[in-house]
C-alpha cells in the first residue's frame, strides 16, 4: 500500500446541506448527506486495514471491532465540526476530540445486557464541558441500521440502577428483572421512550449531543459482517467542548 493510501486523507463536502431533526425540547440531530467527496476511499482504507480492527479495546462496551482513525482523518472531521457544527450545539471550542472506524458485528445472542439498552457518551464530564458525537454511515444497505434517540421514562435513580444491573447481572437475570430481551434497542420500552431517529444512508453524517441516550437500531443482526466492504462500517467522532459562559 502506498503512503498516501495508508494515510487515507479525506475531503468533506465544502458546501454541506445541514438538516435539523428535532427530537425533544432543546435537542436535535443534524443530518448531512453526501458528507465526503470520495467516501469509497475510506471504505477501501478500512478494508486494507481489516486485520488491525480489534474488539474489546478503546471501548469495551462497543458491540464490534474498532480501529483508531488516522491523524489526518481526525483532523478533517474536527475541522468540519468546528466550521459547520460547533455553534449549532452552543459549544465554545473543542478541548479534545477523537475518532475511530467501527464495525458492528455482535449478533443479539452475544450481546451483554448493557448493550440491549440505549446509552449516553458524556459520562462523568465536568459541568462546564459538553460532548457532541458524530456517526458517518459507510455502508449501502439501510437494513444494517441507523440511529435512534431516547429519553428516560423513569426517575434518575431507577435509570442508574438499571445501568448498574446491566453491567452486573447475567443476561437471564437481567431479562427476568427488567423484562428487556436481548437485541439492539429499536423501540420504546418501560424505561426509555423513543423520541426520534435517523435512517442509515450511504455517506450520511449525523451529529448529536452525547448526553442524549441513543442506540444503533439494528432490527436483525443476520447481515452483520466483519468485512468493512459488507458490514456496518461507520466513522465515529467524539468532541469534548467547553460550554458557553453563563
Language model region names:
Residues 2-25, 192-196:
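Short acidic, Pro/Gly- and aromatic-enriched capping/linker segments at domain boundaries
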Residues 13-15, 53, 76, 176, ...:
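Short hydrophobic/aromatic-rich motifs at helix boundaries and adjacent loops
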Residues 108-213, 217-246:
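Catalytic core of non-heme Fe(II) oxygenases with the double-stranded beta-helix
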Amino acid at each position: 500500500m502506498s503512503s498516501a493510501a495508508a494515510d487515507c486523507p479525506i475531503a468533506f463536502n465544502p458546501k454541506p446541506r445541514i438538516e435539523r431533526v428535532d427530537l425533544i425540547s432543546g435537542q436535535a440531530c443534524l443530518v448531512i448527506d453526501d458528507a465526503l467527496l470520495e467516501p469509497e476511499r475510506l471504505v477501501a482504507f478500512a478494508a486494507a486495514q481489516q486485520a488491525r480492527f480489534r474488539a474489546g479495546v478503546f471501548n469495551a462496551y462497543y458491540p464490534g471491532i474498532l480501529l483508531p482513525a488516522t491523524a489526518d482523518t481526525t483532523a478533517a472531521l474536527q475541522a468540519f465540526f468546528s466550521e459547520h457544527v460547533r455553534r449549532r450545539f452552543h459549544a465554545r471550542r473543542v478541548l479534545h476530540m477523537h475518532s475511530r472506524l467501527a464495525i458492528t458485528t455482535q449478533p443479539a445472542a452475544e450481546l451483554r445486557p448493557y448493550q440491549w439498552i440505549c446509552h449516553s457518551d458524556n459520562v462523568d464530564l465536568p459541568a462546564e464541558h459538553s460532548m457532541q458525537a458524530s456517526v458517518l454511515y459507510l455502508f449501502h444497505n439501510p437494513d444494517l441500521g441507523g440511529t435512534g434517540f431516547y429519553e428516560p421514562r423513569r426517575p434518575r435513580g431507577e435509570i442508574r440502577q438499571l445501568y448498574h444491573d446491566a453491567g452486573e447481572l447475567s443476561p437471564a437475570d437481567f431479562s427476568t428483572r427488567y423484562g428487556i430481551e436481548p437485541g439492539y434497542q429499536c423501540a420504546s420500552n418501560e424505561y426509555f421512550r423513543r423520541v426520534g431517529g435517523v435512517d442509515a444512508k450511504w455517506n450520511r453524517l449525523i451529529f448529536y449531543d452525547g448526553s442524549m441516550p441513543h442506540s444503533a437500531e439494528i432490527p436483525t443482526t443476520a447481515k452483520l459482517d466483519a468485512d468493512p466492504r459488507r458490514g456496518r462500517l461507520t466513522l465515529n467522532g467524539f468532541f469534548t467542548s467547553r460550554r458557553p459562559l453563563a
